Amino acid sequence: MENLNLNKHISGQFNAELENIRTQVLSMGGLVEQQLTDAITAMHNQDSELATRVIEGDSKVNLMEVTIDEACVRIIAKRQPTASDLRLVMAIIKTISELERIGDVADKICRTALEKFSHQHQPLLVSLESLGRHTVQMLHDVLDAFARMDLDEAIRIYREDKKVDKEYEGIVRQLMTHMMEDSRTIPSVLTALFCARSIERIGDRCQNICEFIFYFVKGQDVRHMGGDALEKLLIASDXKKAK
């Protein structure tokens, strides 16, 4: 794993503790990415066995969040980190919360697939698979950016969510047209819309992780900035990089 050039501490154990927590976060991220990938596959292929495995695996994601959270609390209490060390710990705490919620989405997709969908709904699921693959790639990329605290990559991924939003809007229009043409499909279309919205929200979760990377690197909290203000800040960051 790439070293972040963390502050050198008198206690080498402190560095080891921080690196260990980062490693755990990336392990959790890898598990969540696999859970999401499997959930999309299970939904598209109507694979009940795979869907069941994803549902059962959600408890492991939850346990990892609790374990990492407790480790962060111990570091804060024991080491009283400051500056970039404190920002790293806080970014980790917030990131694992987002990862756990993405894991919940994978769980919900599988439960919905088991309870609501059948092979006759396959045409409705094709576009959802495409959206799902897009968000899986976003998650993969943001985990890589988090591993390196790569601000440039985080900015690129942040902007990628606009493409996810447009894809989601297209799916909504398609599903609404399908429903208006055949009222018998209303229940299944509404379920597909619920799944599409849940998948689209993964892009928002990835955006949040990008904001935590920005916070660690720049020391600035951008979570509640308006879209225009944040875009100006990102453009300014791009301009500094180009100089």
From Swiss-Prot:
Q: What is its main location?
A: cytoplasm
Which superkingdom does the taxonomy of this entry point to?
Bacteria
Q: Which GO terms describe its molecular function?
A: protein homodimerization activity
Question: Single GO cellular component annotation?
Answer: cytoplasm
Which locations, inside or outside the cell, does it occupy?
Cytoplasm
What are the protein's UniProt keywords?
A: Cytoplasm, Phosphate transport, Transport
Q: Which is a GO BP term held by this UniProt record?
A: negative regulation of gene expression
Q: How does it assemble?
A: Homodimer.
Cross-referenced NCBIfam families = phoU_full, PRK11115.1
The protein's job, in short, is: Part of the phosphate (Pho) regulon, which plays a key role in phosphate homeostasis. Encoded together with proteins of the phosphate-specific transport (Pst) system in the polycistronic pstSCAB-phoU operon. PhoU is essential for the repression of the Pho regulon at high phosphate conditions. In this role, it may bind, possibly as a chaperone, to PhoR, PhoB or a PhoR-PhoB complex to promote dephosphorylation of phospho-PhoB, or inhibit formation of the PhoR-PhoB transitory complex.
- What family does this belong to? Belongs to the PhoU family.
Listed name of the protein: Phosphate-specific transport system accessory protein PhoU
**Which organism was this protein described from?**
Serratia marcescens
